[in-house]
């Protein structure tokens, strides 16, 4: 879930858990603020309607959250959000959004990640987006901040994954995807257009492809990212065929993350990420990248792009104190972190390693809501990320 909306939904759930049995439907008018490096600050208001479950008032059945916001580049944006929680590990959500300047979005997901052994799982994604905040610095690990350019990206993707639980922790699956991308010549004020600064960048003419692959997941974290302890790993590989703008493309990805309880006030967390892309005439937006609120904080989104990428990261999550208001339990924390990583293509994967350091100011609302303000430095200025959820 992106910044702004996510952070506000955290506040909604905080308020909603205070007296869940008072009414089946509760209303919360909330202010809205988000900031990420590529987009700047966004301000607005979001009325939220939360409906409690029919059989258990302590559980949320649905959340409806329309909003109106303003950003200096996108103008006024109207957004409709609906989240439906069907049962444990099964939900769907729909987002519709339009701005007075360029931006449009349709986003639907359905997730059935039940943990029952020998049961089928299903994940569906349909997304269409036009957004003016994309940046491009060129290819390779040695691009400099001064090489920044701007473009608008129009893309559509539809994907599905069907899995089978070998055990409650181990799932194997197959997935398929159809996607199309079209970079457009709409640059942010003060930045050169990517089409002018990088006229030979692969993929500027647009591309479409279909692909299919295999995926294996192992996860002992009973509450996902919010578990006190556990280990998760995922391996995937797919092969795609270009419809237009690209030949063939292969993508291989591996991730691993671990959560370790050290003391009552301290939790350790670490992650490893790797992606390798192979193929002919692969567009830059289909290659491996680092930078953003999840991978390599300290750099803006997609700061480095190439055919391969890796990153390692570790956090120490310190609980400063705990509050109890209206039956809501919240941990207030400061979580310092360090990271190292690199994109690579023609160069060796260890030839131009970069690092970043930072700290997260976080509020964890039991059992599974976290709002964070992460501050990170990687040699190109201090970056701030106001978002919901752990980076891993």
How does the language model describe each region?
Residues 336-344:
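Small/polar (Gly/Ser/Thr/Ala-rich) solvent-exposed segments
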Residues 24-29, 35-204, 370-371, 377-392:
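Gram-negative/organellar outer-membrane beta-barrel architecture
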Residues 6-16:
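Bacterial N-terminal signal peptides
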Residues 1-2:
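N-terminal secretory signal peptides that target proteins for export/translocation
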Residues 195-205, 209-334, 386:
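C-terminal outer-membrane beta-barrel translocator/porin domains of Gram-negative envelope proteins
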Residues 21-26, 53-61, 87-91, 115-121, ...:
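Short loop/turn motifs that connect adjacent beta-strands in outer-membrane beta-barrel proteins
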């Amino acid at each position: 879930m992106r910044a702004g909306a996510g952070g506000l939904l955290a506040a909604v759930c905080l308020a909603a858990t205070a007296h869940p049995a008072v009414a089946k439907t509760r209303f919360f008018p909330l202010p809205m603020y988000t900031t990420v490096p590529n987009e700047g600050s966004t301000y607005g208001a979001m009325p939220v309607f939360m409906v409690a479950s029919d059989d258990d008032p302590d559980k949320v059945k649905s959340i409806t959250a329309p909003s109106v916001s303003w950003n200096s580049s996108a103008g006024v944006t109207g957004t409709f959000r609906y989240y439906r929680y069907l049962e444990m590990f099964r939900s769907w959500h729909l987002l519709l959004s339009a701005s007075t300047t360029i931006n449009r979005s349709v986003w639907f997901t359905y997730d059935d990640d039940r943990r029952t052994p020998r049961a089928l799982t299903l994940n569906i994604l349909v997304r269409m987006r036009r957004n003016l905040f994309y940046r491009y610095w060129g290819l390779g690990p040695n691009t400099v901040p001064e090489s920044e350019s701007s473009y608008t990206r129009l893309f559509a993707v539809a994907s599905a994954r069907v899995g089978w639980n070998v055990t409650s922790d181990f799932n194997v699956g197959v997935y398929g995807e159809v996607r199309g991308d079209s970079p457009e010549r709409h640059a942010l004020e003060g930045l050169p257009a990517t089409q002018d600064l990088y006229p030979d960048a692969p993929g500027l003419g647009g591309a479409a492809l279909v692909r299919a692959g295999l995926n294996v997941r192992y996860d002992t974290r009973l509450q996902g990212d919010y578990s006190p302890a556990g280990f998760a790993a995922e391996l995937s590989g797919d092969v795609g065929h270009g419809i237009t703008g690209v030949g063939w493309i292969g993508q291989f990805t591996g991730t691993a993350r671990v959560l370790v309880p050290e003391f009552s006030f301290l939790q350790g967390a670490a992650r490893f990420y790797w992606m390798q892309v192979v193929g002919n005439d692969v567009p830059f937006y289909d290659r491996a990248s680092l930078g953003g609120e999840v991978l390599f904080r300290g750099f803006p989104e997609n700061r480095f792009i190439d055919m391969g990428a890796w990153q390692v990261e570790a956090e120490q999550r310190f609980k400063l104190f705990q509050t109890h208001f209206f039956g809501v339990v919240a941990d207030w924390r400061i979580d310092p972190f360090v990271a190292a990583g690199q994109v690579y293509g023609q160069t060796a994967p260890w030839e131009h390693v970069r690092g970043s350091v930072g700290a997260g100011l976080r509020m964890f609302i039991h059992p599974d809501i976290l709002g964070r303000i992460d501050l990170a430095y990687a040699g190109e200025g201090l970056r701030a990320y106001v978002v919901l959820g752990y980076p891993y």
